[in-house]
Amino acid sequence: MNPPDIQAALNPVIDAFEALGIVYCVGGSVGSSVYGIPRTTVDIDLVADLQKAKVNSLCKLLQETYYIDASVIEQAIQRRSSFNLIHLPTMIKIDVFAVKSRSFDQESFRRMRRERLEDSVKGREYYLASPEDIILNKLEWYRHGGEVSERQIIDHPWVQRM
């Protein structure tokens, strides 16, 4: 994915989240690329503090340009898991993770910061997970994946240098 496609897929979701007062942060490889060495990625990861009462409004705002399923979102909120959005013009997948109730996740939300995805004075700012939280999340995903995925561990040294 290239930065213009990432922003084309991400901006309407962020616009909808902000219009509905949904707190979010960008993480995963998109987030680690901001703090470290940019690399290709297959999706965009967001963590969001979603409430069931806002699901229908979110769907209405995004249904024209995204594959979005209200029942799947409601299940993700209830289970504190994730759901996918597909940006139809670019076919980019956005994984949205419901914020968990663990202390770490709550603290991570308090440490997020506004950053641009590119080195541009004019670029839009997004809420991003802190470099430290991206490292910890990547290590956690590495552990949950049986410690075999190089994708999670490769980003760590580059983010850590920031």
PLM region spans:
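Compositionally biased terminal segments of proteins
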Residues: 1-162
